[in-house]
Amino acid sequence: MFETPRILFEDNHLIVALKEPNLLVQGDSTGDQDMLGLLKAYIKEKYEKPGEAFLGLVHRMDRPVGGLLCFARTSKAAARLSAQIVDGTLKREYAAVVEGRAKENDTLRDILVKDEQNNMVRVVPGYLKQGKQAVLSYHCAALREDQSLVAVKLETGRAHQIRVQMANAGLPLWGDNRYGKGKPGQQIALWGMRLSLSHPITGKQMVFVAPPEDKGIWTGWRKELEGLAAIWPQIVTLG
């Protein structure tokens, strides 16, 4: 059972909270707990709201992944935050441990197609004229034997994007048993660590940084993780 997510910021317009790994963002056919439902229950109880509380889902995160997510508390905030997703002013940056030795800097551009029936995403050649373009840039922050700690900046937001693109580049995420060499029970080494946006009403620039807990695969990377906050703003899209 999951508890109410840790909330980093809350006002009348939005909530920024931490998603635990393996918690659904939104309910599905499994009937398992989901973050949206937990936060709606929290709002309903805290503010004694009759009926179901409104909470708009602004962006998503794969179930095995943890990290920062923002939600809109009004329809106006939802529309404005969604517009920031489209124009790229709402930025989502991730920390990941990948298998292999990553380049110092790289930009990956691929065309992705999702198999809805199997919930799998694959890279396809561009000439097939199907699928959606996916772009991300990364910086290798540290190397350790056959593993790399990378800071990833998303340019687009496709399903399973980081997992699929990094695996296609020969750098599968540690613990990813869907697209990599992960084993059952391993926790995928992908964490939404930095979120930057403009407040939907005041326009104030807001930046949130929350590293993963020092456990599992993240143990031993603490010093390098602390240095990532200064790296993301410097990552540029190559080519």
What are these regions (language model features)?
Residues 1-239:
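RNA pseudouridine synthases
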